[in-house]
């Protein structure tokens, strides 16, 4: 039996494989690029070795670097995870030559299914129905155009070696065919090094279903039922579930039979998935799409409904162990739904989001599994896939699983980057989610693209950001909100005006404006400019953790650092800059100033010095201006005194904590 496995992957799948290995008593080896040196998967492994610079071709796709790490660590086997090298024959051959166990199917199965053209030929021979189209050897433009006219429009151009939507184009007319073929070929060549194309009739209302297979090296093969993967964006899955709803028993059995027939045809001996498209306009007629000869991202929904650990079975099968069940022994219980949590902005065409995380708190919800590759120390870089992790909910019914999942979405607190969590929650809330699904779901639900829900728009959170900044100044760590003491209602704190004008700006959207706060009490403010303004109440938290606020019946968490305010509510994160009026007696800078110095409480550019050595200043008097986050930040004297020394010059970029102005106490004249 293997006792040390190297996982040739990163992120959430590496962490997920480690979890099973720990349970089995197997030591783990992580590999990492320079960009991933502090990544979560590196810290969770027993051993971690560097394999090269950030670009994948120089690290995670470098077979020699992977083999060198396996040799140096003493690993006996390599698990490829998914993506990267998981279906590359080069890695399998290298493992064989090095005497290492490759945890996956045999080489011939991967080779057969690695080409969409070859896989369709094998599928047809096995009696598996395929989408009408063309997958011939003649790849000339003339022949492909001729076949396109025969198939009819609309149709799909697909890369033979493709996946994840790369090298795929929908063509609606003959006039567009040549241009789209050129684009698809170029993309396929760049992504896969293979420009061969196939053509398929476009199914207008397709469902995307798949069947999980599990085999061993003794000729045994079983299915673990189906998964629904129809909710997609840009041909990439977003939400998956098991079982599939609105599916007849007859179609379900046809899927199982077809998947097993294909698996037997290639002697499949590990975990793999056979994917189908169902034509809703033809009674859910199933057609073979492709076979993935590896673990799938969405494998947890099968694990939760069957109780079978697919990673464990991959390892056991690779070690020559027979499957412990027959087909009739395998049952499933309840319903499971998974969402993929990505670092992206759905409101901006799913634009990727990068940067260091400022906070990361995973949800703890009964019946919900978190497969994550991030924590509070992580940084999202542009070098790798946008997926941060997955939330998978299990329940006795689909409704129970969905509600648990929505609760988990609302409680996964991620700061520092934009995620698709708000969109995922809205999708789960739609009545259409209870109807038969199709791959057009997101296009039909959001015809103009997904937009931030009204309750989370900047104008609704600007006042909360301003209030959070104010509360952070008036409630130092260790203080207790007055809202927790019933009956106490005071006027504005000493040193503060009855109303306060603050300039606010949303870091992502650029939305900016001025909020005028009416300071009703130390723990209660309202937007003076708004009609029928509802108060923002501080309801807890200023003891070192996040502030907790309530506004219009909605709860928020806020963290404040200088003039940067991070807000979190209902699974949605925003970061605001807040600039107070010049001359306030209390500011963020004052809170961080010592009795003898005015210091920069955040990194920034020193744009103005308002004092010089020898000048007498009073408490709260502006002494300098910093520019940070495209806002100007006024630094004020913490007490009266005489300027003794200037610690930085205009034009300097100063780090947080830099003394800008040093003060001496005023000399009292003796009489």
Give each language-model segment a name.
Residues 173, 215-220, 278-283, 364, ...:
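Short acidic-glycine loop/turn motifs at beta-strand connectors
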Residues 1-274, 278-299:
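N-terminal beta-alpha lobe that positions the nucleotide/phosphoryl donor
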Residues 3, 166-167, 243, 385-391, ...:
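Short amphipathic alpha-helical segments
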